[in-house]
Amino acid sequence: MKQSLFDWLGQRLDGLHIVDCCAGSGAFTFEALSRGAGRVDAIEPGEHAVPVLRANAAKLGNPTGLVLHAASFQAVLPRLRDVDLVFADPPFRCYRDGAAEIAELLRLAARALAPTGRLFIRGERGADLPGGSPKLVERERRQYGRSWVALLQREDRTDRDG
């Protein structure tokens, strides 16, 4: 799925400010940096995943532009602004547990995004995004095996490309 997602995003991410919510081992984070992202905020709250994320960063020489956050997206996203791209791969259980956490992620990501920024969020086949996020509009959704990825953008975006 990672390769398909980067084919969708474009091969180069030169200078972009990217946020990787629920970064896990950092696969998306490090791929984005290798494709020229100027800054990637990798957010990972999991006590077992954070050491793996740090070890992977060290193996890669702690790449320039990498900012690791051993914290929840609720703690980090409110401090970020003018983000070009947010990638969120929350645990699928978040969709099954009433989706309140997903709704909060959408709300905070909408505030962090630049006017032309994009949010890519992954979900489990059969699950859906919660309604009631008036600041984001779903532009496209693609299926990848047992999951999907949706592209959302701010409703008030300033470009005219749609």
Predicted regions and their residues:
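Class I S-adenosyl-L-methionine-dependent methyltransferase catalytic core
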Residues: 1-162
